[in-house]
């Protein structure tokens, strides 16, 4: 896997500053620090979303050697994943440099600098049965510390039943065992070295 890239040094246009003043408040930043998640609606323009969608189409047409299918052969759909392509797919490179996401990350982390660790494409085709299991992102990465942000950006309408969910405050720890999505294997840490995730689905009221 490529090493994390250097901080993007391209000056951010003034129009991004204006957009963030309208979309990201001090209360939002405090809420993100408390809950570990924040929904920012209409942050991206239709043209920016279209650019990302074009990049995903290019990625599907020519997957990298890191790509994998996270659904079983008998699944009527397909769950496709690929990583670390922003330097190889022009649309991804433009999306990273020409949208306000770096500034959003900087403000939410309350950091002076921002480094891009990787891009991660996930595509579930219609009819896919494979669910994305509950998990923490942090233990999958080769980094420590609290200044780490994942941004989930849907390019198609997503129903409430299929949308991303979070357990508020779970980012504050403890770290829980990361496992492969399809076969539940522990590949990042030795088995038993971290606590396993609780069964969130069995007791949703306990995990708001």
Where is each model-derived feature located?
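Short, structured patches in soluble enzyme cores that scaffold and shape functional sites
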Residues: 120, 136, 153-157, 166-168
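Non-heme Fe(II)-dependent double-stranded beta-helix
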Residues: 2-35, 41-134, 139-142
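A structural signal for well-ordered alpha-helical scaffolds and beta->alpha junctions
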Residues: 98-102, 148, 182
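Short loop segments at secondary-structure junctions
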Residues: 42-44, 126, 155-159, 169-171
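Double-stranded beta-helix
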Residues: 160-208
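Short, conserved beta-strand element in jelly-roll/cupin
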Residues: 142-159
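Conserved hydrophobic/aromatic beta-strand scaffold that supports enzyme active sites
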Residues: 37-39, 150-154, 206
């Amino acid at each position: 896997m490529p090493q994390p890239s250097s901080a993007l040094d391209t000056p951010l246009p003034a129009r991004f500053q204006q957009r963030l003043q309208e979309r990201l408040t001090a209360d939002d930043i405090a809420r993100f620090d408390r809950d570990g998640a924040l929904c920012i609606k209409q942050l991206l323009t239709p043209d920016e979303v279209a650019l990302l969608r074009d990049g995903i189409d290019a990625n599907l047409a020519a997957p990298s050697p890191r790509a994998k299918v996270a659904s079983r052969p008998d699944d009527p759909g397909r769950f496709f994943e690929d990583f670390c392509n922003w330097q190889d797919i022009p649309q991804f490179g433009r999306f990273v440099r020409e949208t306000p996401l770096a500034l959003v990350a900087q403000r939410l982390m309350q950091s002076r600098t921002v480094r891009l660790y990787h891009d991660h494409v996930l595509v579930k085709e219609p009819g896919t049965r494979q669910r994305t299991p509950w998990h923490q992102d942090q233990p999958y990465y080769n980094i420590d510390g609290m200044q780490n942000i994942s941004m989930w950006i849907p390019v198609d309408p997503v129903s409430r039943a299929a949308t991303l969910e979070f357990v508020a405050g779970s980012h504050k720890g403890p770290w829980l065992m990361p496992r492969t999505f399809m076969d539940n294997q522990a590949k990042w840490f030795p088995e038993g070295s971290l606590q396993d995730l609780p069964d969130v689905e069995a007791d949703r009221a306990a995990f708001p």
